[in-house]
Amino acid sequence: MKHVRLASACLFTLAACASSTGGPTVTSTTQNETFISGASQYDVSSKEQKDVMEQTILAPIDSAWRALPGVFLELDVEPGTVDQKTHVISNTSFVVRHTLGGAPLSRYVNCGSSISGPAANQMKVTLSLVVQVVASDSNGVSKLRSQVDGWGVDEAVSSSRVHCASTGGLEARIARMLNDEISHRTKKAVP
């Protein structure tokens, strides 16, 4: 079968479904490809959706931004990109095996399951983590937007990579850790 990529169109859509209660914003990517086999042509369109979780941080944007690198360090995730202008810290390609931040990886991503349990706990998983602090309409409060996505490979057998979707657990943990870090810093600053 001959594979011809005629068009690779990416369509990014941010749906307006993020709420003040921390609902997800959906980012969609659509890719169109054509496969040719003999005299037959197959047009395939695939769509991938990624949730962007938004959660409230009980501090102004500057305080939250200053505390965010400490959260990455505590999780043992090396920041790949730090953009002070847009308040984004990310690492879009880091490898994790079995656990992340002392917790089973399956708490944060779902890569399917095997006969011995959640596949994420048995695979080499490459994760993408993008976190942004944004201002909120409320005084003294900011918002944390985070997105987790990944791919896993079972190194014990020859296998294709599988998509590992976020469970929302890592996004929630990062928000809790950030609020805790800010609270700790505030208590230290008060005599």
Enumerate the predicted regions with their spans.
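Ser/Thr-rich, low-complexity intrinsically disordered terminal regions
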Residues: 18-191
